[in-house]
């Protein structure tokens, strides 16, 4: 059985983008929520800073979606190559 590469890439993009969005929005409401996670992501994604602003939440969401898209596509491609 092979993975549909586009479907898995899109699913991973949605999940990781939503994870970044929800964590960022929760951090705007409750300042200590997810702070360590967001600081870790700011060290991974260039141009993203873990400051409490809506613009940074949008940037983090876009980075998360792009990261999930690429990661999901690479995972599905590798899986299909070896199975």
Stretches found by the model and what they are:
Residues 1-83:
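Juxtamembrane/disordered regions of integral membrane proteins
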């Amino acid at each position: 059985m092979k993975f549909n590469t586009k479907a898995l890439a899109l699913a991973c993009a949605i999940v990781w983008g939503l994870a970044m969005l929800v964590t960022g929005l929760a951090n705007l409401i409750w300042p200590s929520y997810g702070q360590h996670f967001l600081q870790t992501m700011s060290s991974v994604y260039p141009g993203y800073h873990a400051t409490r602003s809506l613009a940074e939440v949008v940037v983090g969401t876009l980075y998360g979606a792009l990261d999930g898209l690429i990661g999901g596509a690479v995972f599905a491609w590798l899986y299909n190559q070896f199975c």
